């Protein structure tokens, strides 16, 4: 498509005829008596010089506008032609028609940028022409002004000289009249001796004759210069100034018409680009081609494809069948307690996948309380998963067991301490042959997320109260709760994921200190009060800010940061690595060597912060802001400078960058 439209021939002819006719009609205006009177007066030159200066100022101002406009338009075109390509890139066949149509509609910005490029070129040419016109007219005005001032000065100087000769001549005549009235016999002493009155009269008459001659000559000279200036030079200068004024004004009128024509062409070509006259699809037709129902149908239908049938069933929702334990069939009411106990210090809480996204840790389930009669036994047999993400240098030596899953029957829920010890050994990342006994793999349920906890039955009986949550080491809290992530962390993450992801300034805005302190004290009195974190209905923004402040308070109150202080030297080495890939692999290794409590708690928090980042457009929390807030809380201080906050911020940035590589996906 052509970038510019041709000038309409009729418009050009009409403009030309109008201009010629207008010139013929207006030519007689300068022949009117009132205008002739002004042009023939002494004020004509100064008046026309002033008028020409106004035209030059108009030309200069229009030139500045054109320069600013083409600079602005050029920058706009450059940014527009580059930026629209960075959004809604279509890759693959999974994109919806909405995304494809947005991509097509934004493509019109590139086409309009091409159309505007010719407009910018025209503006640049106009600016060059107006600049040359201004420079030329300024020089001509200066030349005419200097010439007129010089001629006026010559006439003025001649008249002034004639006036001085006249004054000298009149003064001598007055002296001669006085001398005639004096005594004839009186003498006058001079440097040359005494002179009689007669001698004085003779000398004075000679001076009068000379002064009279000079006076007459200067009068004739001044009159001659004045007549020449008035009859010849001034009309020529006036005509020249008048021509310059009309010339610059006519040139500016033409430039103004060119500006309007190019602007009209820009608008017309832009309209043709958006709504083509041929069969090409317009911007509106692309926008109307969106099929939301078809997009949703295609998205849902892909779950029927081969290899995705397992996604249709949530293993967490498979009901548990009630089966009485064989040992309970002998009618013995008072049975001795088991001869073994689960030892948390021997890693009785196995590593497994957890999920805190869109799941409340306090959703009650009747099947969980009815299936297991003993809360202690239930909490001692969590599901097993060994998928703790390995760094690249170790991944090849350890086999994955993330898919080993099966429903755990009541008969297999009790494991002896020797068996537990053997499982612990097989889960050791340093073990060269990490194998889990086949009979145990078949009896473990590895797909059940641990984010579902009970508000009343998750704690051992008799120890619900007076167990502090804040200021307690993560290992002690995990051992007490018999879970992988502290309940307060899961509950706070659940609330913010559900209600606060789109809330502006989440984690940046703090809640009332008294409210945070009061809720903290209630939870320290009784861990069951964690349920108080759930906001009331309807909730306010302050309720969500309170949860965010409580979560920050929990991590800040830990005796040791989630990334232990012992790793501060290694973290410093990591941050000094320049290569991004090597730096991420190094941090991956540090994360892999973390204890289970720190590993899984850090994993839950990091994935939650990434979900907050995904809603940056709504909550205005970018990566830098989150790292400034969480870095000093999660990472240890610089071993060489405890006041170096940037060390902790940079460590948090690397941690978020390596999260997908270092942690199991949710």
From Swiss-Prot:
Keyword annotations of the record: Coiled coil, Cytoplasm, GTPase activation, Phosphoprotein
Short name of any one Pfam family annotated for the protein: RhoGAP
Region (Disordered): 1-21, 325-439
Domain F-BAR: 33-295
Biased composition (Low complexity): 409-426
Induction: Induced by stress including low pH, heat shock and oxidative shock. Basal and acid-stressed expression level is regulated by transcription factors MSN2 and MSN4 as well as the HOG pathway.
Name under which the protein is recorded: RHO GTPase-activating protein RGD1
Source organism (scientific name): Saccharomyces cerevisiae (strain ATCC 204508 / S288c)
């Amino acid at each position: 498509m052509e970038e510019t439209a041709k000038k309409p021939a009729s418009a050009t002819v009409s403009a030309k005829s109008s201009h010629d006719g207008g010139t013929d009609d207006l030519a007689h205006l300068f022949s009117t008596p009132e205008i002739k009177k002004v042009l023939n007066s002494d004020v004509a030159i100064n008046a026309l010089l002033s008028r020409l200066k106004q035209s030059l100022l108009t030309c200069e101002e229009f030139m500045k506008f054109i320069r600013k406009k083409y600079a602005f338009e050029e920058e706009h075109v450059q940014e527009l032609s580059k930026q629209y390509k960075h959004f809604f890139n279509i890759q693959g066949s999974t994109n919806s028609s909405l995304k494809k149509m947005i991509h097509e509609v934004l493509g019109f910005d590139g086409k309009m940028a091409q159309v505007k490029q010719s407009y910018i070129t025209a503006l640049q040419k106009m600016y060059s022409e107006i600049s040359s016109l201004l420079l030329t007219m300024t020089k001509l005005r200066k030349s005419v002004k200097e010439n007129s001032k010089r001629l006026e000065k010559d006439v003025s100087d001649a008249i002034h000289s004639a006036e001085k000769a006249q004054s000298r001549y009149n003064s001598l005549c007055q002296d001669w009249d006085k001398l005639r009235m004096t005594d004839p016999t009186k003498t006058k002493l001079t440097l040359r001796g005494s002179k009689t009155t007669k001698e004085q009269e003779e000398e004075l008459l000679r001076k009068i004759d000379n002064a009279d001659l000079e006076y007459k000559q200067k009068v004739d000279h001044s009159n001659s210069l004045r007549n020449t200036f008035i009859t010849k030079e001034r009309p020529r200068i006036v005509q020249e100034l008048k021509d310059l004024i009309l010339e610059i004004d006519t040139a500016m009128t033409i430039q103004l018409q060119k500006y309007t024509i190019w602007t009209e062409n820009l608008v017309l070509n832009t309209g043709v680009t958006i709504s083509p006259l041929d069969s090409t699809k317009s911007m509106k037709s692309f926008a109307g081609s969106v099929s939301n129902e078809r997009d949703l149908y295609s998205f849902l239908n892909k779950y029927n494809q081969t290899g995705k049938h397992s996604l249709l069933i949530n293993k967490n929702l498979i009901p548990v069948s009630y089966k009485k334990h064989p040992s309970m069939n002998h009618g013995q009411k008072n049975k001795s307690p088991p001869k073994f106990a689960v030892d948390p210090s021997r890693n009785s809480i196995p590593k497994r996948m957890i999920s805190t996204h869109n799941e409340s840790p306090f959703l009650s389930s009747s099947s969980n309380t009815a299936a297991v009669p003993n809360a202690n036994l239930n909490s001692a047999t969590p599901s097993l998963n060994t998928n703790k993400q390995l760094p690249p240098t170790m991944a090849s030596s350890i086999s994955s067991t993330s898919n080993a899953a099966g429903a755990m029957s009541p008969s297999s829920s009790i494991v002896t301490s020797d068996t537990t010890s053997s499982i612990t050994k097989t889960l050791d990342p340093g073990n060269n042959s990490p194998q889990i006994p086949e009979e145990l793999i078949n009896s473990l349920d590895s797909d059940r997320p641990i984010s579902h906890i009970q508000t009343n039955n998750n704690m051992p009986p008799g120890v619900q109260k007076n167990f502090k949550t804040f200021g307690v080491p993560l290992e002690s809290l995990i051992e007490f709760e018999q879970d992988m992530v502290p309940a307060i962390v899961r509950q706070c993450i659940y609330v913010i994921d559900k209600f606060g992801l789109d809330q502006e300034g989440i984690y940046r805005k703090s809640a009332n200190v008294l409210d945070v302190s009061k809720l903290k004290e209630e939870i320290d009195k009784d861990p069951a009060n964690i349920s108080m974190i759930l906001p009331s209905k309807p909730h306010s923004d302050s309720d969500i800010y309170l949860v965010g402040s409580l979560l920050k308070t929990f991590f800040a109150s830990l005796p040791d940061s989630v990334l232990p202080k012992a790793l501060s030297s290694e973290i410093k080495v990591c941050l000094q690595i320049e290569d991004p890939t090597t730096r991420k692999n190094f941090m991956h290794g540090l994360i892999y060597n973390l204890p289970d409590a720190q590993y899984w708690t850090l994993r839950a928090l990091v994935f939650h912060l990434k979900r907050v980042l995904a809603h940056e457009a709504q909550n205005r929390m970018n990566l830098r802001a989150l790292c400034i807030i969480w870095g000093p809380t999660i990472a240890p201080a610089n071993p060489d400078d405890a006041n170096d906050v940037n060390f902790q911020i940079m460590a948090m940035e690397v941690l978020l960058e390596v999260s997908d590589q270092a942690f199991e996906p949710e």
